[in-house]
A protein has these predicted regions:
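Phosphodiester-processing cores and adjacent nucleic acid-binding clamps
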Residues: 1-150
Length: 150
C-alpha cells in the first residue's frame, strides 16, 4: 500500500470531480438578496458554478425571485443552465419550490405574491394548501431544506 500526500489526494479528487461535475446541478442556492441567508451576488454564483463545471444552478432566494434577472443575464453566455425557484417558509419549516419551465415560473410568481400580500413587509405568510393549489403540476417541491420538514 503506497502512501499519498494530501496534495496528491486533492489532485485525484479534483480530477474525479471534474469528470462527474457536468452530471450535477445545485438545486438550492441563495444569493445576497436572501438577507442573512446568502452572501454572493447572482453573477458570482454563476461564475463559480461555471468554474466547478456544474451543468445547471437553481437560484432559490427566500420568498422571492429577487436575483433572477441578474442571474439569467450572468448565465446567458456561459454553459451553466439556469433554474428558477424560491425557498419558502410555511407549515413546519422551509421548502424549496422550483419552477418547471415558464408556466411554473408564472405559478410560483403568483404563489409568492399571494404570500407577500397575506403577510407584512419581510414577514410573508404562506399557506401550504394554497401554495400546493397554485403550483400543482407546474413546480417541483424539495422538502429537505436546511430547516425543512425532513
Amino acid at each position: 500500500m503506497s502512501s499519498a500526500s494530501p496534495r496528491d489526494i486533492a489532485r485525484t479528487v479534483e480530477g474525479r470531480a471534474n469528470d462527474y461535475a457536468n452530471d450535477y446541478a445545485e438545486l438550492h442556492c441563495r444569493s445576497q438578496f436572501s438577507f442573512l441567508h446568502g452572501a454572493s451576488s447572482p453573477e458570482r454564483l454563476v461564475e463559480v458554478a461555471g468554474q466547478l463545471g456544474l451543468s445547471a444552478l437553481a437560484l432559490t432566494d427566500r420568498h422571492g425571485f429577487y436575483g433572477v434577472v441578474r442571474f439569467a443575464q450572468a448565465a446567458r453566455d456561459t454553459g451553466v443552465r439556469t433554474v428558477f425557484g424560491a425557498e419558502i417558509s410555511c407549515g413546519n419549516g422551509d421548502i424549496v419550490v422550483i419552477a418547471d419551465g415558464p408556466s411554473g415560473y408564472v405559478a410560483l410568481s403568483q404563489a409568492l405574491t399571494d404570500g407577500q400580500l397575506r403577510g407584512s413587509k419581510s414577514q410573508p405568510i404562506f399557506d401550504v394548501e394554497s401554495l400546493a393549489q397554485r403550483v400543482s403540476g407546474e413546480c417541483f417541491v424539495l422538502t429537505g431544506a436546511h430547516e425543512g420538514p425532513l
